Amino acid sequence: MSSQQIVFLIVNAIGGIAVLGSYAIGLGMFPEYREALWGEVRGTLRTGITISMLFAALGYLSFCYVALFQNGLSDFNKVNWFNQYTVSVLIAIFLISATFWMPTAIAYLNFSNTYWLVVCILSLWVTAISLVAILGITITADLESIGSISHYVAIIGIGLITFHCLVFDAIIWAIMFTK
């Protein structure tokens, strides 16, 4: 296993635990806010967002599979913004910012302080922008190490989570939460 793959795995393991942990702790310690965390998102829109969450998670896992097991990291990291760890750095930014959403949303609901709302929405935008960067890198990657099918799987996978985080979280949820 290459150093790129090891760093990628560590970032995803620690970051994934942090994101899921923030959700578990937030919902476990503040069950009274479960409904309020949806804001004004109701009915069909809520169902659609929930279904999109599942596709986004599967898409991200598909991207990770290509990155780790189809030599995608070697092609994706040729962008060289952060040496050979560009994708891992962007994923760290994505996961760190995603970890902030639940606690800042709960802090806003608990204290009604606009500061928490700003940090909450900013965390959603940082999450979305980092995913847009990863999507751009994935789309423009050379196909030296991976085949076209793996490349398209990675694009569709990261595209699904990017769409969800940008459209449903950073735009729609932010508008509906602050109504």
Each predicted region: which residue ranges?
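Alpha-helical transmembrane segments and their helix-start/interface "positive-inside/aromatic belt" motifs
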Residues: 1-15, 47, 84-85, 145-159
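Membrane-interface interhelical loops and short amphipathic "cap" helices
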Residues: 1-4, 29-45, 105-118, 143-146, ...
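Alpha-helical transmembrane segments of multi-pass membrane proteins
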Residues: 15-31, 167-169
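Membrane-water interface of transmembrane alpha-helices
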Residues: 25-26, 58-73, 132-138
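Interfacial helix-start motif at the membrane-water boundary
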Residues: 42-61
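Membrane-proximal helix-loop-helix units in multi-pass membrane proteins
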Residues: 72-131
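Terminal transmembrane helical module of multi-pass membrane proteins
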Residues: 129-179
